Amino acid sequence: MLNVMIQLLVVSLAVACAAPVLAAEQTHAQIDGTGARIRMFGQNGVGIVLYKDAVCTATYGEKVRASGSLGSAFGSLMGSVKNQAIGIPETQNTRNLHERKMIGSKPFYKEYAIEAGKPVVVEAGASSPAYWTSTPGFKSGWTCGPLLASTFVPEAGADYEVALDLDFRNSLCTLAVKRVAADGQVTPVDVAPVSKDCK
């Protein structure tokens, strides 16, 4: 068990050291106005993936797991995960990030440079682990059901944010894709549903 914890710590430190270099590289496309940027919210129990240059999840140029990896889950659980920003204006979601907090699940966001004019797919899901109680015994965890996925084509110079909004009372999950204006105001993006088999 100690070896596993040490390995997780080493991986977390390596990722933390690489993050500033990646952020510096990603901002270049946005500075010259030809690229776009996207902010993705995550936390322990929420998986969210970005597929670049894709209209489905089977064929894509690059797959970026913003949340749902072992490293991000561990960082969220321990409360050590940090936001990774490349300059997208603040929104209500970033200012009120604490409202997404759950026990053992610190919310965070990561921002990425994306190519304008090339479609992207965002895919997300959420679940909690199963657990045991004295009565009635084994209980399955909470889940959104099937993964939610949407596709859209980013515009040059535009900023976007993607979040999986969870409504536990009504057992409802919504994949919210919004465009971020320079003043931080957001508007919904016209997205299309995604097919896994690219047909």
Can you say where each PLM-predicted feature lies in the sequence?
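Bacterial N-terminal signal peptides that target proteins for export
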Residues: 1-9
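A cross-family signal for key residues in well-ordered alpha-helices
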Residues: 12
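N-terminal signal peptide c-region/cleavage motif recognized by signal peptidases
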Residues: 18-19
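Short loop/turn and low-complexity linker motifs enriched in small/turn-promoting residues
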Residues: 23-143, 149-151, 161-199
